[in-house]
Amino acid sequence: MGEIKVSPDYNWFRSTVPLKKIIVDDDDSKIWSLYDAGPRSIRCPLIFLPPVSGTADVFFQQILALTGWGYRVIALQYPVYWDHLEFCDGFRKLLDHLQLDKVHLFGASLGGFLAQKFAEYTHKSPRVHSLILCNAFSDTSIFNQTWTANSFWLMPAFMLKKIVLGNFSSGPVDPMMADAIDFMVDRLESLGQSELASRLTLNCQNSYVEPHKIRDIPVTIMDIHLLQFHGTKYAAIDPSVVSAEELDVQKGQLDLSQEEP
């Protein structure tokens, strides 16, 4: 349990890359938290936007790897914003503050949706050079919770965390995925009620991405492939190309992970 949080890589990252806090709105309570690593001479960095449960440091492994190859990487944590236009306006101000005219955006889940909304928001004066979308979506209606979006601010923190945790895998997973889930649960615990409520509101508020406004932007789509979905209709790979031997190995790995205390 908690292997990632106590790992040498994570501790080295936290001790060498400073967490910056920046205010760009008139409301001083709206604070952007970010890690900015890599050569400052690069004016078109890769910016990571986290999911509902994520903080800026959930991307520490990507930051360490990419900066080692010479990239400039910025990982963000959002302030409390209650609608997509407010977020886009705040993010634009942040880029202006950082003196970044063009950026590459990587977004996971909610982060991927917000990345698309920002690209849409700036389509007349483009700020997004490319999009990398991991388990993202382009229409909030897929969650069937648009009718509850305006009530999240009323809910206590424990109830909001329960909603988010309901999306985490509860079945047997491979050890690396189990460590990742533990780490994300730990990061979730660090978020306050208003942070969670605002993120869930952005995640479920009735909205969609207008495709014609981002059609000229290169997009890379990443789909996470979990072992328990291997060979099923939920897999990222066509089940017809999965061999019986692979399925036997997968079943054995999951059985072992389930037996471990």
Swiss-Prot record:
Domain AB hydrolase-1: 87-159
Keywords: Cytoplasm, Phosphoprotein
UniProt cross-references to Pfam families, sorted A to Z: Abhydrolase_1
Gene Ontology biological-process entries: collateral sprouting; epidermal growth factor receptor signaling pathway; gene expression; limb development; locomotory behavior; neuromuscular process; neuron maturation; response to epidermal growth factor
Keyword Metal-binding: no
GO molecular function: CD4 receptor binding
Keyword Signal recorded: no
Modified residues (Phosphoserine): 257
Signal sequence, start to end: none
Subcellular location per the Swiss-Prot or TrEMBL entry: Cytoplasm
Main localization, broad class: cytoplasm
InterPro entries (UniProt xref): AB_hydrolase_1, AB_hydrolase_fold, Maspardin
Record protein name field: Maspardin
Organism, as annotated: Rattus norvegicus
Lineage: Eukaryota, Metazoa, Chordata, Craniata, Vertebrata
